Amino acid sequence: MSEKEGKRKSKTVEKVSPKEIADRIKKTADSIATQINKQEDPEFITMQRGKSNVVWDEKKGYLGLGEKEITRTFLNIAHARKFMQTSMIMAKTREYLEHNKTASIREIYYELKHTVADTKENTFEGQDESDPIIVDLEHSVDTIREKLNLHANPKGTLYGDITLLDRMHHNDKFNAAKLGRGGWSIMSRVEPEEIEIVDSNAEYLLVCETEAIFERLIEEGYPKANKCILIGTGGQAARGARRLIHRVHNELDLPTIVFTDGDPYGWYIYSVIKQGSMALAAHSEFMSVPDAKYVGMTIDDVKEYKLEAVTERMSEGDIKRAKEMMAYPWFQNKEWQSQLQKALDQKIRIEQQALANKRLDFVATHYLPEKIRNKNFLP
């Protein structure tokens, strides 16, 4: 396949303008104002969060939020403070959207924190009060935090033949394979309105749990030799990394393969990328990749690659997590039930970097190419 024939053009998806989000906030605020003008007790309605309202959508292949709602009323003394805080955050996020400004969730907390006039009452006592209000607003106006022009600390790195356009910074156009070995640091906000995915010559996306393996694969020339895009998550994938994984998979129509440590923590990292998380179940549609496949590490790899001497014992936390995962509906298939049971029976875990026991380049020259070529995946 020639480079020209192999180039994948991005499809524009999930693009919602800041004006549309600002209008949704205004509509909610107008509804509250109308109730006040009618001398009614104003209400703010959002979705109930928590495990009891998380549902597994087997047909779509990801976690979602149920239909349980909570109603916050101003005249309820238990709700009044949160109602005030919600109104402040609604006004401030709409201001950000209208003036094309972004803020971290820490910055909006400080911007809105003050003592109410003629009282000793602070608007917010800590960020642990403002963060949940932001989530409430996300659910109320049916969007994600990033589209409210809010962001948290970024984490994750992108490398490979993929061209991006940064609309928020002079329309800079760059290829992530030409930024040095360090690649591109994934921002916490990678929405289509800001970061456009232009095109790519890659044939698949490989997501790595550890930065050490991410760097090893780059050093060995794996992305170029195997025509893939790499994303290193540095542990559990941050929101920005999950959003970018979702976008690359869908907009470039690329297979997504995940590579983590062979333990319950690594397997859960995979499940969050694939099916979403309970904490962000409302946003799985924009962050999950139900078609993702898992390449390793697995307990079966220990025998297959003669790694018995470099396994580690599972901790009590690992054992507890494995038992919990066996009960999750999205792990109810024979492949994962078998893998989890083997881990519990043998009480071992195997890290990605244990492959260095064979030799440093083994992961890049043998392990990944062979397993991917043979489609030796877990679902």
Q: What would you call each of these model-derived segments?
A:
Residues 1-255, 264-379:
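Nucleic-acid enzyme cleavage-core boundary/entry regions
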